[in-house]
Amino acid sequence: MAKRDYYEILGVSKNATKDEIKKAYRKLSKQYHPDVNKAPDAAEKFKEIKEAYEVLSDDEKRARYDRFGHADPNETFGGGGFQGGGFDFGGFSGFGGFEDIFETFFGAGPRRRASGPRKGADVEYMMTLTFEEAAFGKETEIEIPREETCDTCQGSGAKPGTSPTSCPHCHGSGQVTSEQATPFGRIVNRRTCPVCGGTGRYIPEKCPTCGGTGRVKRRKKIHVKIPAGVDDGQQLRVAGQGEPGVNGGPPGDLYIIFRVEPHEFFKRDGDDIYCEVPLSFAQAALGDEIEVPTLHGHVKLKIPAGTQTGTRFRLKGKGVPNVRGYGQGDQHVIVRVVTPTKLTEKQKQLLREFERLGGDTMHDGPHGRFFEKVKKAFKGEA
C-alpha cells in the first residue's frame, strides 16, 4: 500500500513553518498515543505521525522529501545492501509483487536473519507534568510494563534441566531450500524456516513460565530525573531501559513523552512566559507600582503614567530555564486597562468634570492623528 503524504498526515500545508509542524505533531501525538487512545488503529496512526514529524522537522530530510517524495534515492531497498533507487516496488503486479520476484531469485539474503543479535524494542511512556514541574524539573519514579528475560529458563525458552536442540526441519540453518518453476525456468528458493522462525533452534520441552519465548511481561520501577525547562510534546531518552535485546543484542531505550498541563494565568512560548494583568483607569492614567506573580515569586513592576492597554513590560530572567542549559527566558507582562461598567452618579459626575477639564488633551500625542482623521472624515475633508 502506498504511503500517505507526510504533510497530509500532520494536516499542514507544504509551506508550513517549523512551529506549525511542531504544533500539529504535538496535538496529534497526544490524540493518538496508545496510552491515551484505545482505538485499534491508534498505535499505527501514532507511528505514522511520528515518522512524518521526524522527516518534516529536519531541514535536510524535508528538502529531500519535497524533491523526491517517498522515492528518496538515498533510501536502500529491502533493508540490505541492494540499492533500489528508493522506489516502492510493492505495486508491481504479475508475479505477486516485485519484492517477491527478488526474494524468489535471491531468497531472504538481504534481510537480517532472525538468529542474529538484535537490539531490544524501544518503550514509550506518556508523563503528565504541571506547568511548574515542567519549568523547574523534578525527580520521580515511574512504573513501565515491558518484556524481560525469563528467570526460570534464563531466556533459553526450554524447561529447566533441558536444552534447545538444532531444528530438525532446517538442520539448524534457519532456512529451507526448495525448487520452483517460474517463467524464467527452475530456480532455487531459500526461505526462512517456518518451524523455528529462522532461529535454527527447536525446543522439545518448553519452559512452563514463559511458554518457550524466553521472556515474561513485568512492570519495572525506574527512577528518572526530569530536566528543568521541558516543554509539551518533548521526549526524554533513557538509554538501555527499553526491552532486552534478542540473541545477545543490546537493550532498547525508554522514551518519556511529556504532556504539560496548561496554567490558568501563565502561557508559555519556548522559554518565555506571557501573562496579562488588569489595570484600573486611574492606575493607567496616574501610574502605579503593582505586584506581578511569576514562577519565582511576586515582583514589583512600576507602571508609568499614561500607560495604554496592550503595553508590554519585560521581566528579564523570570521565564523558564532552557532545557539545554542555554540561559533563562523572560516573562512578558501585558497590561489591560479595565473600563468600569457600573458607576455611581458621583463617579459619573467626576468623570464628566474630568472630561471638561481635560479639553483636547486626549487628541495630543500618537492618538491625536487618528482623532484628527476622524474629525476630517465627518467634515468631508478626507
Curated annotation (Swiss-Prot):
| A GO BP entry | DNA replication
Q: Where are the zinc fingers (CR-type)?
A: 137-219
S-adenosyl-L-methionine as UniProt keyword = no
Q: Which Gene3D superfamilies match?
A: DnaJ domain, Heat shock protein DnaJ, cysteine-rich domain, Urease metallochaperone UreE, N-terminal domain
UniProt-listed SMART domains: DnaJ
Positions of Zn(2+) 1 binding: C150, C153, C207, C210
**Which SUPFAM superfamilies does the annotation name?**
Chaperone J-domain, DnaJ/Hsp40 cysteine-rich domain, HSP40/DnaJ peptide-binding domain
Query: Which regions does the record annotate with the repeat CXXCXGXG motif?
Result: 150-157, 167-174, 193-200, 207-214
Gene Ontology molecular function terms on file: ATP binding; heat shock protein binding; unfolded protein binding; zinc ion binding
Q: List keywords of the entry alphabetically.
A: Chaperone, Cytoplasm, DNA replication, Metal-binding, Repeat, Stress response, Zinc, Zinc-finger
Subunit structure and binding partners: Homodimer.
Known role: Participates actively in the response to hyperosmotic and heat shock by preventing the aggregation of stress-denatured proteins and by disaggregating proteins, also in an autonomous, DnaK-independent fashion. Unfolded proteins bind initially to DnaJ; upon interaction with the DnaJ-bound protein, DnaK hydrolyzes its bound ATP, resulting in the formation of a stable complex. GrpE releases ADP from DnaK; ATP binding to DnaK triggers the release of the substrate protein, thus completing the reaction cycle.
What's in the domain note?
Answer: The J domain is necessary and sufficient to stimulate DnaK ATPase activity. Zinc center 1 plays an important role in the autonomous, DnaK-independent chaperone activity of DnaJ. Zinc center 2 is essential for interaction with DnaK and for DnaJ activity.
Q: What is this protein called?
A: Chaperone protein DnaJ
Please name the source species.
Answer: Geobacillus kaustophilus (strain HTA426)
